[in-house]
Amino acid sequence: MVLVLGLAAPVAVASVASAAPVYCKLNPTFTVPQVIWVDGSGSSQTTRLCARVSPGRYVVQRGPYAGHVGRNGVAAPGAKREGDGKTPYGSYPMRGGFGIYANPGLASSWLRTSWRDVWVDDSRSALYNTHQRLPANGRWASAERMRLSPAYNYAQVIGYNERRTRGRGSAIFLHVDQGRGTAGCVSLPTSSLLAVLRWEKPGAWIWITQ
């Protein structure tokens, strides 16, 4: 018996190379493990989630996500003022989250808001730029309500002006996008915002540029 052996067709072997990392253009002095990089252009912005891989070097782990900053853009360094419709430039710690709905997965404190929760924006008040609860009882003349839908369905406090310097701006949050520039906050569509909140670990900072 004679066996006739066929020749197998050559199989192309493709080398699988890992995608080259995309580095974040951040302040080289950063040492925190995670940075939310928000790059503004007019009232629009692009957010990238950056993780440290070595001292001063960060790679993009998530994003880009499109959203908005202040309706009047990003303020020049140190130039942010109360009511100017601008988002403050610079780097700030991310603080606790809050919202109408339950914590979606943020690994930090979460406040389920009620109609009584407000953030004081009266620069003459001793409680300027802090979370308080109604009634005001003369303690402030104006405040941002924290139970607003859809903007504050999910939100997180950006640790801006924590020294509470009068007139330098208050109530700067990361919150749900409404399709237009904000009063000074950073906003993202709900799906993108939830991705950010679930990615974050305690100790993350935000870096806002233009």
Language-model-derived ranges and their functions:
Residues 185:
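Short cysteine clusters
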